[in-house]
């Protein structure tokens, strides 16, 4: 079975390397064009391109996928395409040239779109998973080939859930290819969407419900991290370890207590325990270290 692989970030490159190491015949790879990254704004190859080059697999980065993609298919004659976080919608006639299947990090039709892991955490989902589906002309709306579920812990972070879904995605991909072609069935249920992360999404407001605060911190931990303001400085907060309902709280964002577990902050309807705080230009440190360093104390208040 000859495979054309399309993908861009590290979530995709891990799946590509998994295919190669399991001796699947990846005949060509398509990735997004390289972009400037980091403080120096140097142009760097995409993670998928790096893996393709490592294994000497032909890799292409077309700016116009429909026309250039057809010539790639004509040249390498793949039987199917595997798509993982490529970053662009596939359109006819390229889309119709071979069957394309997408590995998506949610239980479709929930969380169609670019940020399914973050949005599932933000909404406090207790279950999520991987869906492999045949790509149609809409966004993540094609018939399903395979679904795999995974539970989400109360204090699960983006980082930990990402790793679990990466492992589950590889498992699902292996099962899918070993049983190809699949028996497809339509998506059922009301679709929900997972739009790209905006700067506004990262702003933490302690006047929101305490469970909402907990979930927002988890959704962007460890990257890029939610932001709040303390004593006029923009800080980031990481690793929620505790929540408790308290309807008597009237002041939001107040540091109620700091101990070796972390900082306990008031929010609407309850208290949120947070382990790490990051000050501008510094690495994250525990709340206790920040207290001992004179950076934060009980009674201080976070502003939204």
Swiss-Prot record:
Gene3D superfamilies: 3.40.50.12230
Keyword field: Protein biosynthesis, Transferase
Catalytic activity: L-methionyl-tRNA(fMet) + (6R)-10-formyltetrahydrofolate = N-formyl-L-methionyl-tRNA(fMet) + (6S)-5,6,7,8-tetrahydrofolate + H(+)
Source organism of the structure: Thermosipho africanus (strain TCF52B)
GO-annotated cellular components: cytosol
Gene name for this UniProt entry: fmt
Highest rank taxon of the organism: Bacteria
Pfam families registered for this protein in UniProt: Formyl_trans_C, Formyl_trans_N
Name used for this protein in its record: Methionyl-tRNA formyltransferase
An example Gene Ontology molecular-function term: methionyl-tRNA formyltransferase activity
